[in-house]
Amino acid sequence: MTGSFHDEMIAILPRLRVQALSLTRNRAAADDLVQDAVCNALAAQHSFTPGTNFSAWMHRILRNRFISDLRKKRETGNIEDVPASAMAGSGAHEERLVVKELAEAMNRLPADQREALVLVVMQGMSYDELAAATGCAVGTAKSRVFRARRQLATWLYGEERDLSTVELRGAVQRLRARVGEPVAASF
């Protein structure tokens, strides 16, 4: 493994874990998914063209691995298991309820919208990067994020409006500060 490839791989691991958590909604499954995606990337390292978007390449590998695993698991069971530890945290009961409500709302979003929202809002991906990582058109990526924001606003505030990236990031940061745990891990 070349130094640059290795450095990029190490740097992207936290963002891959966030994406994996948004897809699997389970910490152990997310860790397994990231590990499998890294193994796949190492095996396919020769196919990566230096100078191209490494982040999009890795997110695509992770997403494809998730889809493959999902197809295999479809025959044996459902992956909709959310461990109680995903909702646990330190802080007042009310604050935990707010985090739980946000996590439940995120979990109710369709997988493609949840993934798009996490990658754009939490990880700061551009719409172009999101489109490349998920294999969809830029317009589709934008509409997924828009629909996810609007649906969250409806569920959380009881009104149909769009949550801006700034509002959503601010809400997540306030929740993180109150509870003292990474909110993205709850998704």
Label for each model-derived stretch:
Residues 1-18, 28-31, 42, 54:
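A short, charge-rich alpha-helical start-of-domain segment used by transcription regulators
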Residues 4, 133, 150-187:
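C-terminal edge and immediately downstream basic/flexible tail or linker adjoining helix-turn-helix-like DNA-binding
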Residues 8, 12, 16, 20, ...:
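Residue-level preference for hydrophobic side chains embedded in well-ordered alpha helices
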Residues 32-39, 43, 52-64:
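Structural recognition of an alpha-helix C-terminal capping motif at a helix-to-coil junction
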Residues 49, 60-81, 95, 147, ...:
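Arg/Lys-rich amphipathic alpha helix in sigma70-family domain 2
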Residues 68, 76-102, 126, 168-182:
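Internal acidic/polar
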Residues 107, 111, 123-140, 154:
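Helix-turn-helix DNA-binding module
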Residues 116-120:
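A short pre-motif secondary-structure segment
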